[in-house]
């Protein structure tokens, strides 16, 4: 028995040393996925090529749409699954906060018949108050929940095996905020909060908007996060418009955001070194809002990666090494939990029973995600809330469904 045990131990030690040696020999690689709205779907094509070539990465940093792709990938979504889910999403509906008419309360139906959509206003302590964005992002946030299976428990950034960083901007002071821990879906939502379009996200004492304003191509964060010796950088930003095409309030606002973004992108590009790999997919005719062209953008990203295939292939490992890396970053998706308790939190003025009357989830039964999301939209349709979200908590071994309505400030 003892000689067999010693031989087995020696073999295991040999494999461990071989893996450690291989990891030590290859350079540490950071992946940088820039922001650009729908153009960011090009990142999917890059991930497909990295997967085919067996190129492992040690961390990923993303901004805006790059944060969405980075987060979904780190949470276990494969490039093929991402192409499928993002390509078939109803983006026009996701970027509309209006619930289906049948999900509106009687009060909200009457208001929708009497007033223009998006014309809400209210009175608060300081006077008249209006929404802080064209949309609250209600449906977008629920979509993020679906992507990363938040119904089985909210993924936390610090718990993901692959280190991931997301960039947001504090709209109060203009500072760059790097999100490395906390709720994955909240970080994705914060990094994508385009000013004026999506309402800022209040999170950890900050009011956060799109990270593209301060760091649309977070090269420095990738180097710092995992000590990357080489960064693979994908820039999908929208080019600036010629001056004669900048017209109207919306056009001027978009150009101002573009100018701020362009300045920080140039600063990031100036730090690239000879060993780094830079991709700029040909997305000239795909706009930041062209979400119906997700598949096409992914194909363009793939083409850009294929053009750099020899350089990317130099970072590849053998099949066994890649399998080890895949196991190391794999995310175990828990089974659908049985709910032991339903909580409603965050209410000050609205009665908790007003929320609970919409909830069909039974205590002791498995969580029914589709029904829950319909119920959440019905709660939102009452018209009293800026947003309504949910999370599944593990409270001393008990699965708690927490529903979190945020009452309107207007």
List each model region and its residues.
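Patatin-like phospholipase
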Residues: 22-63, 71-395, 408
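N-terminal periplasmic accessory domains that precede
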Residues: 398-407
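Bacterial N-terminal signal peptides that target proteins for export
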Residues: 1-10
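Bacterial N-terminal signal peptides
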Residues: 9-18
């Amino acid at each position: 028995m003892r000689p067999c045990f010693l031989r087995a131990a020696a073999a295991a030690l040999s494999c461990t040393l071989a893996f450690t040696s291989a990891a030590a020999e290859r350079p540490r690689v950071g992946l940088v996925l820039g922001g650009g709205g729908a153009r960011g779907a090009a990142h999917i094509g890059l991930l497909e090529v990295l997967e085919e070539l067996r190129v492992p990465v040690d961390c990923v940093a993303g901004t805006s749409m790059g944060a969405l792709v980075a987060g979904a990938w780190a949470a276990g979504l494969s490039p093929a699954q991402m192409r499928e889910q993002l390509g078939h999403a109803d983006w026009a509906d996701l970027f509309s906060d209006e619930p289906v008419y049948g999900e509106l309360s009687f009060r909200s139906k009457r208001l929708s018949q009497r007033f223009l959509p998006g014309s809400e206003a209210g009175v608060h302590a300081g006077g008249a108050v209006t929404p802080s964005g064209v949309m609250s992002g209600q449906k977008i946030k629920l979509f993020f929940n679906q992507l990363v299976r938040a119904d089985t428990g909210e993924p936390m950034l610090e718990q993901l095996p692959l280190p991931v960083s997301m960039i947001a901007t504090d709209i109060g002071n203009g500072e760059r905020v790097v999100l490395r821990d906390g709720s994955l879906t909240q970080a994705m939502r914060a990094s994508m909060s385009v000013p004026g379009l999506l309402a800022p996200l209040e999170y950890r004492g900050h009011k956060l908007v799109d990270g593209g304003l301060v760091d649309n191509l977070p090269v420095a964060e990738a180097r710092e996060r995992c000590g990357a010796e080489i960064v693979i950088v994908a820039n999908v930003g929208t080019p600036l418009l010629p001056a004669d095409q900048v017209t109207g309030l919306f056009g001027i606002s978009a150009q101002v955001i573009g100018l701020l973004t362009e300045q920080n992108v140039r600063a990031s590009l100036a730090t690239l070194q000879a060993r780094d790999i830079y991709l700029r997919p040909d997305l000239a005719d795909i706009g930041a809002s062209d979400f119906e062209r997700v598949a096409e953008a992914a194909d363009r990203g793939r083409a850009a990666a294929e053009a750099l295939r020899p350089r990317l292939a130099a970072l590849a490992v053998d099949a066994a090494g890649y399998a080890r890396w895949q196991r190391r970053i794999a995310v175990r998706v828990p089974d659908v939990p049985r709910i032991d308790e339903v909580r409603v939190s965050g209410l000050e003025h609205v009665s908790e029973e007003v929320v609970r009357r919409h909830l069909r989830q039974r205590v002791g039964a498995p969580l029914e995600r589709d029904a829950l999301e319909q119920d959440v939209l019905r709660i939102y349709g009452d018209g009293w809330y800026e947003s309504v979200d949910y999370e599944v908590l593990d409270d001393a071994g008990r699965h708690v469904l927490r529903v979190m309505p945020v009452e309107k400030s207007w």
